[in-house]
């Protein structure tokens, strides 16, 4: 079970949004690289980074901040936001990103995901962000007519490394993960699934360690860390004990 601390980038700063609304952004750190180093020092083993401006623009917009993070941390980094073509994927993987996350393009251009997964095995994840059961795209500004399961099933045999499933209604609101929907998705496909949206406290860690969540690869945690509602040492120790049991 992997806990992915999240760094969301807006105007080169580390922010958290509420329900994906760019007008409801709280700046938590002016220096994303320092934030990444802090997460590494706390013992996290995999970093989750999103270029929020890039998600809206359809191309990388916070490249300088991402590159600064890649220089200071040795842990794997998965990156999403504005990754819509093979050239961008190849560029980021070449710069040291471990895994790219394709969101909007996974809905609009599934062939891109399949080709990328073929060219870069194990290094392409799909981000599915759902609002009322339907997948949202373009930085969550638009909602499609397809469900997360319908899209995930398109990639069943494509070699996608993971599906990151976000419940937009909970994102940034500290209401707890939507494990029912996430587990239902994980049980319907063979691709590993990562839970995202609403992580609130140590109770979410405990829920992730229950037998029913065994198919999940992990979860992304954002505001709960920044607000001090989740003690990293306590969370990682709990996961470590469960892994050793």
Swiss-Prot record:
<dbReference type="GO" id="GO:0003949">
    <property type="term" value="F:1-(5-phosphoribosyl)-5-[(5-phosphoribosylamino)methylideneamino]imidazole-4-carboxamide isomerase activity"/>
</dbReference>
<dbReference type="Pfam" id="PF00977">
    <property type="entry name" value="His_biosynth"/>
</dbReference>
<dbReference type="InterPro" id="IPR006062">
    <property type="entry name" value="His_biosynth"/>
</dbReference>
<protein>
    <recommendedName>
        <fullName>1-(5-phosphoribosyl)-5-[(5-phosphoribosylamino)methylideneamino] imidazole-4-carboxamide isomerase</fullName>
        <ecNumber>5.3.1.16</ecNumber>
    </recommendedName>
</protein>
<feature type="active site" description="Proton donor">
    <location>
        <position position="129"/>
    </location>
</feature>
<dbReference type="InterPro" id="IPR023016">
    <property type="entry name" value="Isoase_HisA-like_bact"/>
</dbReference>
<feature type="active site" description="Proton acceptor">
    <location>
        <position position="8"/>
    </location>
</feature>
<comment type="pathway">
    <text>Amino-acid biosynthesis; L-histidine biosynthesis; L-histidine from 5-phospho-alpha-D-ribose 1-diphosphate: step 4/9.</text>
</comment>
<dbReference type="InterPro" id="IPR006063">
    <property type="entry name" value="HisA_bact_arch"/>
</dbReference>
<keyword id="KW-0368">Histidine biosynthesis</keyword>
<keyword id="KW-0028">Amino-acid biosynthesis</keyword>
<dbReference type="InterPro" id="IPR011060">
    <property type="entry name" value="RibuloseP-bd_barrel"/>
</dbReference>
<dbReference type="GO" id="GO:0000105">
    <property type="term" value="P:L-histidine biosynthetic process"/>
</dbReference>
<dbReference type="GO" id="GO:0005737">
    <property type="term" value="C:cytoplasm"/>
</dbReference>
<keyword id="KW-0413">Isomerase</keyword>
<comment type="similarity">
    <text>Belongs to the HisA/HisF family.</text>
</comment>
<dbReference type="InterPro" id="IPR044524">
    <property type="entry name" value="Isoase_HisA-like"/>
</dbReference>
<keyword id="KW-0963">Cytoplasm</keyword>
<dbReference type="GO" id="GO:0000162">
    <property type="term" value="P:L-tryptophan biosynthetic process"/>
</dbReference>
<dbReference type="InterPro" id="IPR013785">
    <property type="entry name" value="Aldolase_TIM"/>
</dbReference>
């Amino acid at each position: 079970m992997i806990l992915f601390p999240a760094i969301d980038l807006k105007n080169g700063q580390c922010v958290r949004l509420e329900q994906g609304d760019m007008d409801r952004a709280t700046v938590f750190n002016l220096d994303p690289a320092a934030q990444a180093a802090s997460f590494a020092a706390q013992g996290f083993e995999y970093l989750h980074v999103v270029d929020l401006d890039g998600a809206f623009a359809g191309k990388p917009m916070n490249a300088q901040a991402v590159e600064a993070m890649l220089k200071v941390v040795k842990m794997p980094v998965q990156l999403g936001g504005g990754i819509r073509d093979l050239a961008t994927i190849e560029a980021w993987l070449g710069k040291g990103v471990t895994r790219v996350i394709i969101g909007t393009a996974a809905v609009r251009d599934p062939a891109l995901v399949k080709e990328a997964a073929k060219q870069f095995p194990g290094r392409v994840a799909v981000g599915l962000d759902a609002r009322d059961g339907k997948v949202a795209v373009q930085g969550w500004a638009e909602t499609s007519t397809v469900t997360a399961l319908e899209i995930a099933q398109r990639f069943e045999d494509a070699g996608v490394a993971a599906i990151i499933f976000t419940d937009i209604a909970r994102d940034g609101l500290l209401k707890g993960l939507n494990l029912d929907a996430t587990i239902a998705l994980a049980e319907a496909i063979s691709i590993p699934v990562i839970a995202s949206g609403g992580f609130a406290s140590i109770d979410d860690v405990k829920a992730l360690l229950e037998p029913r969540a065994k198919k999940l690869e992990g979860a992304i945690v954002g505001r709960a860390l920044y607000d001090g509602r989740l003690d990293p040492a306590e969370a990682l120790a709990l996961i470590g004990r469960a892994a050793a049991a």
